[in-house]
Amino acid sequence: MRALKKIINLNALRHNWALIKQRSLPATPMVVLKADAYGHGMTTVAKTLDDARYFAVSCIEEAIALRHLGIDTPVVLLEGVYRADELLLCEYYQFDTLVHNFRQMQWLKEFNGSVKAWLKVDSGMHRLGFTQDEIAEAFAQAHSLPVNIQWQGVITHFACSDEDDLTHAKKQLACMDRLVLPAHWKRCYANSAAIFALPQAHYDYTRSGIMLYGLSPFMHGDGSAYGLQPVMTVITEILAVRHLEKNETAGYGQGFTAPESGWLATIALGYGDGFARTITSGAVPVLIAGQRYPLVGRVAMDMAMVWLGSDRYAEGTIVELFGSHLPTEEVARAAGTIPHTLTTMLMPRVHVEIVGG
């Protein structure tokens, strides 16, 4: 079996979930499972968190997959339906749909079945949702729909709740607080960062995404600073070790030049596994025997290279790419990206090992 694998720690997942429930109070947290639970395995996460009151996914395909697992927990579609006929599936499977534009509102008007819906408001993200110029008309149309359309509440999304300066997030919250809602409508505003940074935005429901998987929702630090534990650890092995003299080159296009006499390791990791060819720059670390070493040269389809300098390790030595001992956030920053991209990028051929079951 190929050495590259991701290890999913269910004990860490349960720990994070317990923390989220406590930090979300008085709200109830939704579990965000989009993109295969941020690469952690939607099936595994959903079955482990069997006390969750709500799941949130991007699209109807993800929601149907949950139902096929026998999971009957309420599910909300964060992008709503893409076609009018998907409302029939929402009714059949008992999904909640988000409504973020007038096209979707028209589909609801024409729908003869029964469905639960949430109204999405663009409070300043300027991505999805009814804008401030549209919101009055959106509410008027929502209130005019027959009782078969069961409005659950209103949702928005913060653009900058993960930053030190919360000015924009607070402006968005003030925008939402000006809305006059029916008494039974619920409010779902806070994402992972806002669960920590904006307790005044908790209201009825929060949405726990990246923090559920043990990673910091902020632009700095790592999850451990907030009591979180990484759920995913990705490891591989050294396949070969070569000694290079100073200025000797290695890899495609002679992409690496040895800065001095030393050792170069080849590891089982490539863009065929989902590891982007552009990630290695000499700044991205891996962890071997507790020491950090840089990825160098060009990532190939199945292999990458690590400069060991004067150190030497045997073939078969474990290499941690990110996770329990090498923070995913640190690797992401070095790669010029965010942790979400690292956990979601890995391809199906990467073996998965579940621990803590």
Curated annotation (Swiss-Prot):
Its EC number is 5.1.1.1. GO terms for biological process: D-alanine biosynthetic process. GO terms for molecular function: alanine racemase activity; pyridoxal phosphate binding. Disulfide bonds: none annotated. It catalyses: L-alanine = D-alanine. The modification N6-(pyridoxal phosphate)lysine is found at residue 34. Its cofactor is pyridoxal 5'-phosphate. The keyword Isomerase applies. Pfam families: Ala_racemase_C (PF00842), Ala_racemase_N (PF01168). Catalyzes the interconversion of L-alanine and D-alanine. May also act on other amino acids. This is Alanine racemase. It comes from Dichelobacter nodosus (strain VCS1703A). The lineage of its organism: Bacteria, Pseudomonadati, Pseudomonadota, Gammaproteobacteria, Cardiobacteriales. The gene is alr.
